[in-house]
Amino acid sequence: MAYAIIETGGKQLRVEPGRFYDVERLPIEPEGTIDLEQVLLVQTDSQVHVGQPYVSGAVVSGTVMEHRRGPKVIVYKMRPKKKTRRKKGHRQELTRIMINEIRLNGESLGG
């Protein structure tokens, strides 16, 4: 099974064709396609291609499924004996993408 390690949103992610992943919000409408060219590593059935920093000629293509929000994270700050309390919540904006295929030098490795 071929897989790739990509960089998106300042994070590294191991992706495989046919699976979906939640990444940082991307400025692409749902049902739109995306080509991720910041590929750090590509693993085929017989070889490993490691980039320095990126693998040249490697592209991971996918489809934007939907935009969503992550789970709520509560931040609570309190100073004892002072009646000072601060409660904040945060939900991260995410984009769910379906990985269609991994291409290396124009040749499809999966999908």
Curated annotation (Swiss-Prot):
One of its GO terms (cellular component) is cytoplasm. Keywords: Ribonucleoprotein, Ribosomal protein, RNA-binding, rRNA-binding. The keyword Mitochondrion does not apply. PROSITE patterns: RIBOSOMAL_L21. One of its GO terms (molecular function) is rRNA binding. InterPro entries: bL21-like, bL21-like_sf, Ribosomal_bL21, Ribosomal_bL21_CS. This protein binds to 23S rRNA in the presence of protein L20. NCBIfam families: L21 (TIGR00061). PANTHER family: 50S RIBOSOMAL PROTEIN L21 (PTHR21349), LARGE RIBOSOMAL SUBUNIT PROTEIN BL21M (PTHR21349:SF0). Belongs to the bacterial ribosomal protein bL21 family. This is Large ribosomal subunit protein bL21. The gene is rplU.
